[in-house]
Amino acid sequence: MAGKGKIIGIDLGNETNSVVAVMMGDEAVVIQNQEGSRLTPSVVSWTKEKEVLVGDPAKRRAILDPENTVYESKRFIGRKFEEVKEEAKRVSYKVVPDEKGDAAFDIPNAGKLVRPEEVGAHVLRKLKEAAEAFLGEPVKKAVITVPAYFNERQRQATKDAGKIAGLEVVRILNEPTRAAMAYGLHKKENVRILVYDFGGGTFDVSILEGGDGVIEVKATAGDTHLGGANIDERIMEWLIEEFKKEHGIDLRQDRTALQRLKEAAEQAKKELSFKMETEINLPFITIDPNTNQPLHLQKKLTRARLEEMINDLIDRTIDIVKQALEDANVKPSDIDEVVLVGGSTRIPLVQQKIKEFFGKEPHKGLNPDEVVAMGAAIQAGVLAGEVKEIVLVDVTPLELGVETYGGVMTVLIPRNTPIPVKKSKVFTTAHDYQTEVEIHVLHGERPLAKDNKSLAKFYLTGIPPAPRGVPKIEVCFDIDADGILHVTAKDLGTGKEQSVRVEISSGLTPEEIERIIKEAEETREEDRKKKELIEAKNQLDHLVYQLEKTLKEAGDKVPADVKQEAEKVIEEAKKTIETATDINEAKELQKEFSRYPQSSEQPFT
């Protein structure tokens, strides 16, 4: 089953699940995780013993230990705390600014601030290990997908997460583009599709044209704050308000109750995709402070009521679809197929709105949870030389430019420009005898610099003094195939190049990334030792059970002195099972049991 130098494809999910796939021959195969599931919840939890749980084991702890369990971390990756203040209020763990003002998580059991990149790395490491178990060989490289609307900082942070997990991220790719590849657009002739990607935390729409081994992205649009989690929040808010009306208690103040409400809301949403009504039943949700008696939450929610709650959210997705169509200069009737991606597309109202808008049923032949990872695996196959003849032309989601005199944003690369791309413009000084200029790199659609997202700042110094307008400064923007931006500036006046290369930082320095990698390695060693100790104790427990059973069955056939000695060994083993922290202690005791028969048929001596 092994293949030389396999590159895996990973869909690093946000609110819900992550998926890993790999090319096996001509087919993209989704790999099961260690629990036997094809979907791995993007959840990480820290125990009191500082053990790190990932996936289903972590998700099961979310209600019991909400402060130490992180979900939805992708919402915070590569973001400043000030940007995510409101979102931070909606999770059960503490989101705080680190020393640089970046969003981080204050996890008591971790004993430190945990960065979103570290959480992503734990999930990626689990997927990497699942792939290694499946392939029977080490995996060192991966293609990872991100929402099309992720900015450069968020993309770099995702690459850093891969590095921490021990993966070389050979390509960062837009999720809708991967879905088009899994759909087989490159195999069709002159087809135009629209990918409607409604996931747990983000919404993206891309319009692509394909044929003869080429996939070209014509337009992309989206919202990184619109997804299934927003639907869950609407249900949660309804439950909270209904409970408050009935009992006068605001459940927002109770972190454990909030986590239970979140899980119940998500489950209700899923059930209403195939049922007309569901009952939400949360016994012992809180205690009445006046009577000190437990209170229960029990509510019926109909599909019609849910659709009323979320109608405006689905309409927002259609508005974004309209924007993408306008950018691509096409009409709804020009779209040959609408491909659905993301678990939220299972909602009947979503499918109904798409059908009404396009006048046709959306394509439902692909599993919306797995399609992105499969597309990533196909791209990984292209990079590994296993899949031939696919040319991909992706685009930039937002305008990129610099701040110029008067606080204006001057655009160098317009929205929906195919990448990779390199563009430059020549600027001059604003003041007489100016010897340095500030290059302020911006990302956004607004005309004024202050209204757009600041990506980077640097100074070009050593400009010979001259009247304003004389020096000529060339600024070059270069976006690579990963969508990562590099900026260079040089003084053309002297003929001598002075350049500064700016690579967008995720907020982590190389030293910090190395420290996190080292910590992860140390944690992995600790986890391995803990696992080995547990296995040794389990083996000891089995030996105790076996010897007790043998002694009982043998009865009077066992000499009194041998029985007394055996019981002493059993007692010591039981204490060791309870208290031992050293594996050698358990292993040494295992040797004692080899002196006794494993069956009453064998003689005791």
Curated annotation (Swiss-Prot):
Q: Looking at the keywords, is Zinc present? A: no
Upregulating conditions? By stress conditions e.g. heat shock.
Residues bearing Phosphothreonine are T202
Q: Which InterPro entries match?
A: ATPase_NBD (IPR043129), Chaperone_DnaK (IPR012725), Heat_shock_70_CS (IPR018181), HSP70_C_sf (IPR029048), HSP70_peptide-bd_sf (IPR029047), Hsp_70_fam (IPR013126)
Q: Which UniProt keywords apply?
A: ATP-binding, Chaperone, Nucleotide-binding, Phosphoprotein, Stress response
Q: Which PROSITE patterns match?
A: HSP70_2, HSP70_3
State the CDD domains in the record: ASKHA_NBD_HSP70_DnaK-like (cd10234)
Superkingdom per UniProt = Bacteria
Q: What does this protein do?
A: Acts as a chaperone.
Q: Which family does it belong to?
A: Belongs to the heat shock protein 70 family.
Q: Which PANTHER family match?
A: HEAT SHOCK PROTEIN 70KDA
Question: In its UniProt entry, what is this protein called?
Answer: Chaperone protein DnaK
Species, as recorded: Aquifex pyrophilus
